[in-house]
Structure formats: structure tokens, C-alpha cells
UniProtKB/Swiss-Prot annotation:
<keyword id="KW-0997">Cell inner membrane</keyword>
<keyword id="KW-0131">Cell cycle</keyword>
<feature type="binding site">
    <location>
        <position position="294"/>
    </location>
    <ligand>
        <name>UDP-N-acetyl-alpha-D-glucosamine</name>
    </ligand>
</feature>
<dbReference type="GO" id="GO:0005975">
    <property type="term" value="P:carbohydrate metabolic process"/>
</dbReference>
<keyword id="KW-0573">Peptidoglycan synthesis</keyword>
<dbReference type="GO" id="GO:0008360">
    <property type="term" value="P:regulation of cell shape"/>
</dbReference>
<dbReference type="InterPro" id="IPR004276">
    <property type="entry name" value="GlycoTrans_28_N"/>
</dbReference>
<dbReference type="GO" id="GO:0051301">
    <property type="term" value="P:cell division"/>
</dbReference>
<comment type="pathway">
    <text>Cell wall biogenesis; peptidoglycan biosynthesis.</text>
</comment>
<keyword id="KW-0808">Transferase</keyword>
<dbReference type="Pfam" id="PF03033">
    <property type="entry name" value="Glyco_transf_28"/>
</dbReference>
<dbReference type="Pfam" id="PF04101">
    <property type="entry name" value="Glyco_tran_28_C"/>
</dbReference>
<comment type="similarity">
    <text>Belongs to the glycosyltransferase 28 family. MurG subfamily.</text>
</comment>
<feature type="binding site">
    <location>
        <position position="163"/>
    </location>
    <ligand>
        <name>UDP-N-acetyl-alpha-D-glucosamine</name>
    </ligand>
</feature>
<dbReference type="GO" id="GO:0009252">
    <property type="term" value="P:peptidoglycan biosynthetic process"/>
</dbReference>
<keyword id="KW-0133">Cell shape</keyword>
<dbReference type="InterPro" id="IPR007235">
    <property type="entry name" value="Glyco_trans_28_C"/>
</dbReference>
Amino acid sequence: MTASQRTLMVMAGGTGGHVFPGLAVAHRMEAAGWRVVWLGNPAGMEATLVPKHGIPMEYVRFGGLRGKGLKTKLTLPVNLLRACWQSLGALRRVRPDVVLGMGGYITFPAGVMTALSGRPLVLHEQNSIAGLTNKVLAKLAKRVLVAFPGALPHAEWTGNPIRAELAHTEPPQARYASRGGPLNVLVVGGSLGAAALNEVVPRALALLAPGERPRVVHQAGVKHIEALKANYEAAGFAAGEDVRLVPFIDDMAAAYAAADLVICRSGAMTVSEIAAVGVAALFVPFPHAVDDHQTTNAAFLADAGAAVLVQQRDLSAELLADWLRGQSRASLADMAERSRSLAKPEATDEVARVCAKAAGANLEQLQ
């Protein structure tokens, strides 16, 4: 670290929805010559993932209360006090010029101590319904940013920071116009798999006449791939040219860009990535998401005719098959264009600029 080098501390943890957008901003700031240090939980996924990106870490132990037992609730005051003390120690060691909170339980004690120590705090909320931590910290932050309009009062709509390759794909009009033959459908279950999609999609395809069936790439997660194969076999399909079953996808930008339609859950980053690429989507929100935020995430696109939202309780093979029969590449291309128009492809740069400005830095450093 040079005497003139500025430092950003990113605090985020718990889930990829918090960590990955934080990494996008971290790399953008590093490219502009900033030093970046990450504050996270040693037991969280960030402790494994972030060091692989060459970013040093500070650790604070703190967990949430949702779904926890009486013992956790009774020990909360002690655990919170300890986490605040650990956070203060990290802030004193790192001496950041600005702190960016991307969400997760760890953000609360660290965010409070950032504000009390007089350092500028920038918050970013990825979901359409803000979590409790960000609702509280928004009152202490210098700048509050949101991925979806209205998630927090008096916030700036920047969108979600995403990987650069997703923000620079070919426009949907050109992609869709160059294709012929059956529709290309991408089904994304994520690393955890999505049992409802894994069960319903094969049965829906079986209800379609051979000439109506799309080409399908179905991703289900390593732990669920064998069950998925069994579901397709039970529906009368053998994996082949028109049905590819994969445990994971290395290049999501290419997978999204090759699809006419994506069938998936509606986590914040998934919705943002689909809009950035510009691809039609049928969202089936995870029904047990906190505050049902996946429904409102999906509604942001669905209400504009840029996607279709089907609740899991309403999803059936018959409904999906009927809906697919009514789609054409032209109708899906229109949906994709609407989706692309709602994207914020410059979100990573915008969040980085806000952080720089909060630290009193020259924004030209991020051009």
C-alpha cells in the first residue's frame, strides 16, 4: 500500500447473492488502483471464496436470529457486543477510506461501528425487499443504493453489480433474429437444485408433440443430477442432442445468450443477469424466501411484460406445456427486448463511483 493509495473495505457474507456483487465492485476498484480488504465471517462462504480472488480478509463472528433457537437469542447481546468490538479492531487495522456494505448478518455490527467511527458507509441492497440489517443501517449510511426501485426510501437506483461478460452480450434482437428451428430453453436450478423445476419440466415436455418440443439444457446441481436424469427417463426422454442435463454451467453469459427462454428461480442476481443479457424468462420464485422477496424480484420484470411469473403452488406440467405451445421465437424476443431495456449494465461502475465519491476521491480514477 502506497501513501496515496485509497482503501475500500467490502463487508458482505452468507450467500452468493451478497458476495458476488461485492466481488464485482472489489475488482473494479482494484483496477482503478484501490486497495480492497474484505470483512466477513470465518464460517461463511466468503471465507473460502474471497481469498481465491486475491483479496485479503478480516474476520468477525456474527450470525442472525431468523429460525434460531432460544439459546442463540439469549446470547445475542454478548455476541453482538463481541462482533462490534471485532469490527472496530478491523476498522482500526485497515483504516478504510470508505466501507461498502453488501448485505448479510455480518454487515450489521460492522456497519454500526463504521458509522460510529466517522468513516463513510455506503450500502447496497440487492433484493426488491430490503433485509432488516439494511433497513436499520440505511439511517446511518452516507449513500444508499438499491438494485430495484423502491427497495429502500431515499435510495439511488443503481442496479446490481454483475460480471462484465454478462453486461456486454450481443443485443437480443440480433441474437433471436439469427436463429431458426426449435426454441432453445435453459432451465436453471442453481447449485441447490430446484426440485419443482426438476420434476415439472420433464413431464411438461412429455406432453408436447415431438414437433413442438424445444431444445433443452437443464442444470440441476451436482447433488441432484442423477435424480434429474431419472425424471427425464421416467418422462420418456433419453439425454441427447435435444436434451442436455448438466450439474453446473461454467459460462453463464454464453448459456443465457444462447437461450430463447430461461426457466428459473428469481434470486436478485439471477433477475439482474437475465435483464442485463436480455433474454425471456419464466420465473418460479422460491416459496420460502425471506419476506417472499423472490416474488417481488420477478415482478419487477413480469409487470413490464419482460418475463412471466408463476408461483410454485400453481406450476404444473399441464400449465407449463400449454404456455410453451403458445410461445414463438418472436414473442420471446419481444420479452427479451423489454427485459434488456430495464437492465442497469453499468451498475458495477456506478457503485464504484459512488464509493469513490463518498471517500472524497477524484471520480476520474474510475474512468
